[in-house]
């Protein structure tokens, strides 16, 4: 039985089974306070940064899985159960959960007692709000125990030094509010570290701040010893293992519904906590928070909507893909069920790609994020790899051959969305001092690549390109990336256009000449006969060739030969035919074929430690699939493009593999799916935070549906199979709302007219 259903009118996925193969997550956030929560109530909250201001424990990779979280125990006579289903052994008789846009809701019933718990981070205050409604079929007295297992805010410090540092923590009660003070020596940014508070709008009959008192020795969240006592111990904690637990007694009459709210929040001082709680306890606070949340998402989604005969694709394009994309834009690749949130800040490469997809939906946010990325560029044009704007730590300074070129693509598409190049005159600082206009920044991106070319004429790999595992081909500094040459060519085309519009014909000609050089190399030296080679090692060996014993064909150089236009038309078609022949599976396109052993190309300089079919070594790397979809659209092969897109839709991939094999969420994209050379073929891995989200959105909206900005207006250039026609699209562009009906794959330009607010057109 399918354990879920989509309810698109509410933008929700509703689950009927709590013990799905892995935790299926949702993200809650107001931009400052954040949380992720599973379908069983497990999860973690953090203030601004999960590295230095993590609020509660979440035990990654441990058993039982998905612990701890945000739990509300209901004690009804001798029975103790949770609306979240977990962690109690005593289960509800009826249960379902729903993940929505910025909230998660649980509905459960046991012995005539119905409970509905809604979790959200309020957009009005820095508080994670737990709203609980109880309805009884008879008179009864119940006690509600909300519980959070607190941890040290610095996760890595806790792993290493908790035996000392936990005795520098304080959790105490003041005026009915539990307050957690994190005051550890040498902590980063102590003046910005908030107090965390826990309270309810129902008077508490007891509380605990000491985890040992509430949970008990050799106990777990499944059966806390505190629930066996008449009352909690009112324990405070000045050193030890902290928690928040409240005891909230309620009397319910037959047929009566009572609601209560629990507040897990942050403020800088006790007085600010009091003010915040006064606002939170207003009768309409929950309703107002939900309404503001709904309004913000309605505005977000209004920039692009579509209607398609394929309702799975429509569900992803209209709701879950842009929702996931926004979460990537907000959190980069920092913390998820798979990523511990301990070492990655904001990746320049990662976030620059997120910006591309955000431009049509939230233009100002996209510009702001792009300008933040520019601060990580050096005067010579290269960029830091990732950085820590909240934590203030030193950035990771590895020089990759691709990072700075993504900035060119961002700048181009921002200018294109506006229809002019004036934005490029905006000043932006360099990381190593001084400043320049955005135009000067991206010109330096081009200069850096031209000054770092290899012996064969392709860009040097440097620390690696987009495919991080290729760092081993360039340890001596001579390895070259054929793929980066293709990315460079895409950037050069964009720069040529921008230069012409800025009145710099000499630079435009320079870009044109550089492009021609890469094109000539690609059509000769990079061409292997049936596909394009991938890279060149320090010793001059071509990786990605029929003559090689392993990893003969790589996906990215085939798709980007089309995206860049470097290959001849015949080469482009042949390369993508080879993708279909050697790399395509019913669960997506493999990254390479065949997978490598751990002694290729040599035992000393092996390219991978991954098992065959896993990760970089022959999995379906979903991010890279997106470029193949775009390439097939550019070649005007809609059947291939749609196959590659449709088979990767998470609900379709899960159905193909089977829910127990696929494991991950059926409503968001994953980074990779184990390939056919693995005995776990079909296992989805690293969901939510992946560049797949941004590029699947771009592939669907700008290439399959074909609605793309141009300098002169909105271009409609769809590439859809016949069974998907007619399709309808709403796109807001330069202040005008376009209502477009697509009846055939025909190219059409809708010129922009200043002042026009709406246009309805049929293609």
Spans of features found by a protein language model:
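Anionic coordination/interaction segments
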Residues: 1-350, 364-372, 413-417, 501, ...
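Aromatic-rich carbohydrate-recognition surfaces in CAZymes
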Residues: 75, 346-351, 355-458, 481-489, ...
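Hydrophobic, small-residue-rich alpha-helical packing segments that form membrane-like cores
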Residues: 102-105, 124-125, 152, 438, ...
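Inter-helical turn/loop segments and adjacent helix faces that build the functional surface
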Residues: 135-140, 270-274, 417-431, 492-512, ...
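Catalytic cores of carbohydrate-active enzymes
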Residues: 147, 164, 384-385, 487-604, ...
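Carbohydrate-binding/catalytic loop surfaces
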Residues: 336-345, 384-403, 431-433, 437, ...
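Aromatic (Trp/Tyr) and acidic
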Residues: 544-581, 622-625, 629-635, 644, ...
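Surface beta-strand/loop "capping" patches
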Residues: 709-742
């Amino acid at each position: 039985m399918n354990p879920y259903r989509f309810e698109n009118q509410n933008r929700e996925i509703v689950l009927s089974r709590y013990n799905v193969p892995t935790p299926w997550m949702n993200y809650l956030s107001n931009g400052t306070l954040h949380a992720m929560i599973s379908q069983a109530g497990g999860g973690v909250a953090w203030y601004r940064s999960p590295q230095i201001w993590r609020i509660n424990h979440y035990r990654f990779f441990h058993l039982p899985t998905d612990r701890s979280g945000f739990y509300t125990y209901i004690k009804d006579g001798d029975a103790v159960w949770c609306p979240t289903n977990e962690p109690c052994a005593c289960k509800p008789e009826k249960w379902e959960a729903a993940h929505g846009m910025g909230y998660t809701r649980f509905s459960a019933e046991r012995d005539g007692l119905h409970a509905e718990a809604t979790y959200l981070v309020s957009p009005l205050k820095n508080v994670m709000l737990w709203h609980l409604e109880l309805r009884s079929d008879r008179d009864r007295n119940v006690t509600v125990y909300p519980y959070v297992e607190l941890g040290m805010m610095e996760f890595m410090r806790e792993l290493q030094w908790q035996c000392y540092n936990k005795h520098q923590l304080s959790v105490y009660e003041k005026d009915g509010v539990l307050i957690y003070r994190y005051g550890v020596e040498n902590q980063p940014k102590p003046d910005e570290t908030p107090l965390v508070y826990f309270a309810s709008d129902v008077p508490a009959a007891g509380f605990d701040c000491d985890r040992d008192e509430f949970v008990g020795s050799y106990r777990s969240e499944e059966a806390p010893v505190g629930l066996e006592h008449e009352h909690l111990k009112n324990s405070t904690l000045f050193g030890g293992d902290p928690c928040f637990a409240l005891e909230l007694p309620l009397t319910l009459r037959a047929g009566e519904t009572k609601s209560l709210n629990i507040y897990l929040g942050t403020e800088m001082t006790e007085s600010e906590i009091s003010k915040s709680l006064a606002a939170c306890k207003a009768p309409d606070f929950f309703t107002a928070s939900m309404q503001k949340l709904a309004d913000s998402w309605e505005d977000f989604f209004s920039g692009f909507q579509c209607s398609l005969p394929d309702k799975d694709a429509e569900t992803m394009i209209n709701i879950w893909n842009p929702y996931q994309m926004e979460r990537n834009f907000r959190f980069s690749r920092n913390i998820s069920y798979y990523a511990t949130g301990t070492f990655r800040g904001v990746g320049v490469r990662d976030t620059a790609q997120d910006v591309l997809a955000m431009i049509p939906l939230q233009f100002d946010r996209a510009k702001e994020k792009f300008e933040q990325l520019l601060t990580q560029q050096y005067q010579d044009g290269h960029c830091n790899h990732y950085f820590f704007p909240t934590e203030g730590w030193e950035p990771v300074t590895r020089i990759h051959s691709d990072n700075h070129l993504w900035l060119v693509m961002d700048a181009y598409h921002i200018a294109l969305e506006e229809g002019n190049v004036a934005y490029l005159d905006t000043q932006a600082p360099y990381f190593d001092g001084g400043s320049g206009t955005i135009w000067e920044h991206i010109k330096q991106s081009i200069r850096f690549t031209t000054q770092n070319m290899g012996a064969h004429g392709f860009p040097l790999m440097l620390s690696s390109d987009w495919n991080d595992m290729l760092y081993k081909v360039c340890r001596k500094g001579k390895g070259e990336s054929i793929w980066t040459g293709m990315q460079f060519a895409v950037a050069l085309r964009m720069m040529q256009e921008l230069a012409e519009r800025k009145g710099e014909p000499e630079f435009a000609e320079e870009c044109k000449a550089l492009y021609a050089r890469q094109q000539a190399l690609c059509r000769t030296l990079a061409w292997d006969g049936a596909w394009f080679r991938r890279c060149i090692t320090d010793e001059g060996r071509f990786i990605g060739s029929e003559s090689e014993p392993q990893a003969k064909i790589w996906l990215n150089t085939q798709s980007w030969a089309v995206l860049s236009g470097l290959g001849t038309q015949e080469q482009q078609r042949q390369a993508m035919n080879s993708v279909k022949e050697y790399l395509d599976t019913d669960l997506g396109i493999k990254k390479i074929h065949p997978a490598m052993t751990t002694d290729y190309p040599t035992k000393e300089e092996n390219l991978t430690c991954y098992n065959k079919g896993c990760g970089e070594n022959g999995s379906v790397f979903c991010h890279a699939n997106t470029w193949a979809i775009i390439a097939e659209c550019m070649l005007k092969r809609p059947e291939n493009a749609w196959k590659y897109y449709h088979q990767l839709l998470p609900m379709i991939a899960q159905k193909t593999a089977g829910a127990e094999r696929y494991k991950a969420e059926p409503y968001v994209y994953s980074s990779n799916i184990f390939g056919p050379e693995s005995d776990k073929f079909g296992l989805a891995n690293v969901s939510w935070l992946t560049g797949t989200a941004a590029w699947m959105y771009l592939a669907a909206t700008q290439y399959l549906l074909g609605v793309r900005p141009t300098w002169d207006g909105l271009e409609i250039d769809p590439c859809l199979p016949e069974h998907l026609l007619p399709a309808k699209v709403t796109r807001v562009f330069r202040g005008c709302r376009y209502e477009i009906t697509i009846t055939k794959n025909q190219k059409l330009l809708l010129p922009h007219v200043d002042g026009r607010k709406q246009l309805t057109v049929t293609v």
